């Protein structure tokens, strides 16, 4: 059962990552958005997830691995591609944005 969802804000010059907790049929924000490459979003997200001791190591690793995949995709090719393509590539991630 999925307990968390990675949320992505897809922009022209940045990509931002946040995590929501799935509660019932909805979600509740767990973290703020962390921006890449403006800041080290991955490291900031890692620290934030580690501070929430009730999140299991497995859940934390899965979220960070998926964040790595999204950041790498955005850096390598995604920043020049429409958000709809990223949504197809990462269907388990919630996307929003202007690009």
Curated annotation (Swiss-Prot):
Q: Does the keyword Heme apply?
A: no
- Tell me yes or no: is Cell inner membrane among this UniProt entry's keywords: no
Task: Name the GO terms of the biological process aspect.
Answer: translation
What are the protein's GO molecular function terms? structural constituent of ribosome
Classification via InterPro entries: PSRP-3/Ycf65_sf, Ribosomal_PSRP3/Ycf65
Alphabetized, the UniProt keywords read: Ribonucleoprotein, Ribosomal protein
Instruction: Give the matching Pfam families.
Output: PSRP-3_Ycf65
Q: Which GO terms describe its cellular component?
A: ribonucleoprotein complex; ribosome
State the Gene3D superfamilies in the record: 3.30.390.140
What does the annotation say about its assembly with partners?
Part of the 30S ribosomal subunit.
The role this protein plays is: Probably a ribosomal protein or a ribosome-associated protein.
Q: Which family does it belong to?
A: Belongs to the chloroplast-specific ribosomal protein cS23 family.
Q: What is this protein called?
A: Probable small ribosomal subunit protein cS23
